[in-house]
């Protein structure tokens, strides 16, 4: 406690002898009061600009995001019966699980894709690694497979140059 008291006394002595303190005491009382009010005003302005406005902007963007997400949720809920109905009505082409490897290889070649590696993962499942190819060719091929009853269980895509991707896919018969 004694150390703190001594430190406080030294600090006060230095503050009283500093140039700024001497100039402050030399000002008329009215000027000191005006400077105190100006300092308080500037402190409020800084607090408003540094804390309040950014928080207000963040709150506004969060409200907008929430509104957009609520609208998206309502749209999804509204469209869910249509999706279920369309899914139930869509005929699924059934393929023989044993013929999956040949079908994947043939359809990939037809789509202009080169199969780098094809591993059998058991009954009705294969793992495919494709050489880099345009993404625009890969997507229609996957849609074609889906239409034939082949589901993409896992997909790993690595972006290459010029819109090309290399893909690692786990495919299985639905």
Swiss-Prot record:
Keywords: Cell inner membrane, Cell membrane, Membrane, Protein transport, Transmembrane, Transmembrane helix, Transport. InterPro entries: T2SS_GspM (IPR007690), T2SS_M_periplasmic_sf (IPR023229). Residues 53-174 are periplasmic. One of its GO terms (cellular component) is plasma membrane. Disruption phenotype: Absence of XcpZ results in decreased amount of XcpY in type II secretion system complexes. It is found in: Cell inner membrane. Its main location: membrane. Disulfide bonds: none annotated. Residues 1-32 are cytoplasmic. It is a single-pass membrane protein. Two distinct periplasmic domains, one located in the proximity of the transmembrane domain and the other located towards the C-terminal part of the protein are both involved in the interaction with XcpY. Type II secretion system is composed of four main components: the outer membrane complex, the inner membrane complex, the cytoplasmic secretion ATPase and the periplasm-spanning pseudopilus. Forms homodimers. Interacts with XcpY/GspL. Interacts with XcpR/GspE and XcpS/GspF. Inner membrane component of the type II secretion system required for the energy-dependent secretion of extracellular factors such as proteases and toxins from the periplasm. Plays a role in the complex assembly and recruits XcpY resulting in a stable complex in the inner membrane. Provides thus a link between the energy-providing XcpR protein in the cytoplasm and the rest of the T2SS machinery. This is Type II secretion system protein M. The lineage of its organism: Bacteria, Pseudomonadati, Pseudomonadota, Gammaproteobacteria, Pseudomonadales.
